[in-house]
């Protein structure tokens, strides 16, 4: 019948590059921490190809997961926030997993909002396509390249991540690189090796975020998280010899 979307994506089903096809698993209507210096709404998009054990949004991993918000309703609400919000941040999941990301960014920019992106760099080709539309990137780097698969559960993932770091650094877009620190996955010597990799690419600002057990579905990592272990001053000094702008964020 006319007007019914067919299972094969025909009929009136939205094109996968139409912003209406964006699969949104969650929305934070107001954040002062997800885009430095800007007040932002955050869209959490469904889908991620990686299976990092410390992920605190595991419900967003599946691309066809629980889509809780539709794009049209979001932009309708966003129109009421003009003058109150500065930006929209696309997070996830892995936002670059969705083909409609660039079109959604263009649409929201046209409404007068800056664009932020949180990404792990799993899809460097799509990242390259959307970078010209982005005002700030928070890029999650998991581990030294040879150890990437042990964190993400996907062999070869370090190649994509390395390419994405190079893209972001070379783009001139404002950004920060950040790494979650759990010494079972990223012990001190791994962090030093990662600092060498990042320095060789030209990274100058690097945020270390201590592991947070909240939302982590992997009990092994929660149980192994040491109560008193921190990135100490001696380790920080070694890292800053390589990447001057290293900071520890959080407890």
What are these regions (language model features)?
Residues 63-67, 93-94, 114-117:
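Short, flexible loop segments at the rims of nucleotide/cofactor-binding pockets, characterized by
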Residues 58-89:
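Conserved alpha-helical substructure of the radical SAM core
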Residues 1-37, 170, 185-251:
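Auxiliary Fe-S-binding modules of radical SAM enzymes
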Residues 16-28, 47, 60-61, 69, ...:
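SEC14/CRAL-TRIO lipid-binding/transfer domains and related phosphoinositide-recognition modules
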Residues 44, 91-92:
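A secondary-structure boundary/capping signal
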Residues 33-69:
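Canonical Radical SAM [4Fe-4S] cluster-binding loop centered on the CxxxCxxC motif
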Residues 75-87, 96-223:
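Conserved AdoMet/S-adenosylmethionine-binding subsite of the radical SAM
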């Amino acid at each position: 019948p006319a007007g019914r979307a067919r299972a094969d994506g025909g009929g009136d089903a939205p094109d996968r590059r139409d912003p209406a096809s964006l699969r949104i698993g969650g929305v934070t209507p107001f954040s002062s921490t997800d885009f430095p210096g800007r007040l932002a709404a955050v869209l959490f998009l469904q889908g991620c190809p990686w299976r990092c054990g410390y992920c605190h949004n595991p419900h967003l991993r599946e691309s066809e997961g629980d889509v809780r918000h539709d794009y049209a309703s979001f932009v309708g609400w966003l129109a009421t926030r003009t003058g109150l919000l500065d930006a929209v941040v696309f997070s996830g999941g892995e936002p670059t997993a969705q083909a409609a990301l660039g079109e959604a960014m263009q649409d929201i920019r046209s409404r007068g909002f800056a664009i932020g992106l949180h990404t792990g760099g799993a899809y460097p080709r799509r990242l390259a396509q959307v970078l010209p539309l982005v005002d700030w990137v928070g890029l999650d780097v998991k581990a030294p390249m040879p150890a990437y698969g042990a964190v993400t559960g996907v062999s070869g993932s370090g190649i994509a991540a390395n390419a994405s770091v190079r893209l972001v650094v070379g783009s001139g877009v404002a950004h920060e690189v950040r790494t979650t620190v759990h010494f079972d996955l990223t012990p001190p010597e791994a962090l030093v090796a990662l600092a060498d990799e990042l320095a060789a690419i030209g990274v100058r600002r690097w945020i270390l975020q201590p592991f947070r057990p909240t939302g982590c579905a992997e009990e092994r990592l929660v149980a192994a998280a040491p109560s008193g272990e921190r990135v100490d001053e001696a380790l920080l000094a070694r890292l800053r010899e390589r990447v001057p702008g290293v900071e520890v964020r959080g407890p």
